[in-house]
Amino acid sequence: ELAEGQLWEAFMAASNFELDNLRVIIDRNGLQATGKTMDRFRIGDLEGKMEAFGFEVKVIDGHDVEEIADALDWADTVKKKPVCIIANTVKGKGVPFAEGIASFHNGTLTQEQYDEALRVLED
């Protein structure tokens, strides 16, 4: 999450210009293509960092559609500050062979994996 320097530069500019129409949604799943995010980038207190950049922050369950909708409604009430919604998620949630496994961050599923994922998610 947030390994690119230009993101942090944009965050600084967003609060400086009071971009209250900006919604940043961070998918915090803790994984990247090579493994756990924290093994490569020890970002620490993400909520505190975004607040320090001048954002109004809300942390939600990124798998809960109602929570997502409520957070977006809440964002519309924030004035003179950009908004950051940190969505805690599990990569591959609900698909046993992929859930929480970094190697499924990118790449292509086999036809068998694809069929199994659809079957599990449709149940």
Label each region the model flagged.
Residues 1-123:
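Glycine-rich ThDP/TPP pyrophosphate-binding loop and its adjacent helix/strand module
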